[in-house]
Amino acid sequence: MRTFLQKNLPWLLISALLGVLALLGVCQPDAPPCVYVSVDGQIQKISAYENADGYHLFLPACAQNARLQLGLPAGASLRVGDAILTDGMDCSSIEPGRVYSLTLRGEEVPLTVYRSENTAALFLQTRPGTMDYLHESKDHKATASLLLCAADGTQRHADPSVTLKGRGNATWKYEKKPYSLTLSTPADLLGMGAAAEWVLLANATDQSNLYNRLALDLAAQSGLGWTPDSRYVEVYVNGSYLGLYLLTEKITAQPGRLELDSGEFLCKIEFSSRWNTLRNPFRTARGRTVEITAPKVPDASVAALVNEMEAAIFSGDDALLAATLDVDSWARRYLVDEICGNIDADLASSYFYYRDGRFYAGPVWDYDRAFGSTPRNHNPRSFIAAPAEKGVGYRSLYYGALCKSALFQSRVRALYEEEFLPILQALLQVDIQTLSDSLRAATQMNNIRWAEMFAHLQEADPSTGALLQYLSARTEFLSSAWLENVDYRTVQLQLPGSDTYRNFAVEARCVLDLSGYDLKADLSDIRFLRADTGAVFDIHSPVTENLILKLEYPRGLPPAEPVPEAPAQSPWDPAIIAASLGAFMLCLLGLLTADRRNRRPPSGRQQ
């Protein structure tokens, strides 16, 4: 064995080195085609993305008037018109929307070019392997350099050392990840004010990329107080296009954002299942899980004050409620949640803060599963945020109690008519379509890059037309309840195998109409059982009270509802496998050659 190692040590070392380089991503065979873009004097590499349809080159808006230089593996070429371009040649003549013929490894494959419009570009550079490390855990942090360029190509910010980290709860499991950014020094990014901490929202469950932005804009325009500002950016990491993100101010207590004095604090309602992930959590007298997010070292009196707030909400005393809460802020946040159909309203990511001796609701956050995008909020003609019961084990305590208050209801109706309805009318008539049109090119690029993920997750029509239709129907329903005083009852259906409810609004003393809802079986074959008593409810009888009904089907019906999950991510990168196999084969060839050489007798010696 010792002789074997001595004779073959060089080959073994070469094999090991190639394997390590492959694992680090430094030496991968057949690197994808790329272009080098000159952005405000700096060169940025943009690598093409490959799927079953060929290669896709996603260029940022700032590349429109920039010089482009082609990067190709040895022997590869790109046909542009009558010209054959090879590695290092100018390719500024390529146009978005065109498909070019790429010769790679002796085969012709299509290369489709896209270019964004109206959107800034965020370039991040990290060491090889950094993103894999980050994706192993949200607790992992890494350093990167950052370059932010406006759509016109002007540099807006550069930072040689930003801290990059994963974030999110349910959104973290998706292939397109959300991140947090911490700059080395506070800076004003795209006109949102100077700060060090920022968030990159991935909108992985929102193919329209509109939901979070619309909810934030609705809150800001309604006067809810400080609301995180946001801008769309195309994100590139080490030359790879990660898609369209929403660069957003982080919810923090600091000057220029949510401003709090000594003795004041910011809290967030969360699911109890997330207890171990929370910083400074506690449970209220009624069992709510609350996280103290600011200050970092809270005063011992915070829990007692929150319990006083909770007692006032459930007291039934409007005078006490007005003395304890800023009722208008709670009404405004409720209106944002109800209008948007926020399924997590008053359950998770639900912020409130204590300032000037009273409790305020807000800022708003997390609307990527709103606007009818799930079975739980798909019906626009229903109350979604108001019902106290959201499902088995899911209780919206505060909204449920507040909606019983005459003071709260009167402020909801007045604010809806005076402030929210004009905003909704502008959104429906102009604003949503205008925003969607401005993102058309960026959304197309994002949806092609993440087509496989979206196909797996899709639960609702992602088109702008569907969003407009949903919001229009929702506005019509809420106006009938709050302006026309139609008396509604809420009926919630629990399907077998589901722990959440489907909400319906029924005019008092009318029959629930389920004709437009696919129950996967004939209505006559389903038993509707009252959740409170277990008694059978005649679905053809008038509804006189709020009801939760559990559906009981004949054996074998309905088929189980698929639960969308993020597609599994393989830890094996094909390029790494190819490089490792190549290194192994090279080593094997070397060993065979060495073995043959060792077996050959010296010249002039008898065998």
Go through each PLM region and give its residues.
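Append "Rare intracellular matches occur via the same short Y/T/C beta-strand/loop motifs
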Residues: 68-70, 95-106, 514, 545-556
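Secondary-structure capping and domain/repeat boundary segments
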Residues: 43-55, 83, 485-567
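Predominantly extracytoplasmic/ectodomain segments of secreted and cell-surface proteins
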Residues: 19-95, 103-113
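Conserved oxyanion/phosphate-binding beta-strand-loop segments in alpha/beta enzyme cores
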Residues: 142-151, 155-202, 298
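Middle-to-C-terminal accessory/interaction subdomains
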Residues: 170, 288, 296-347, 353-499, ...
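C-terminal membrane-anchoring or membrane-association module
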Residues: 585-607
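Internal "kinase-insert"/substrate-recognition segments embedded within catalytic cores
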Residues: 187-188, 202, 224-228, 241-335, ...
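N-terminal Sec-pathway targeting helices
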Residues: 1-15, 573-577, 592-599
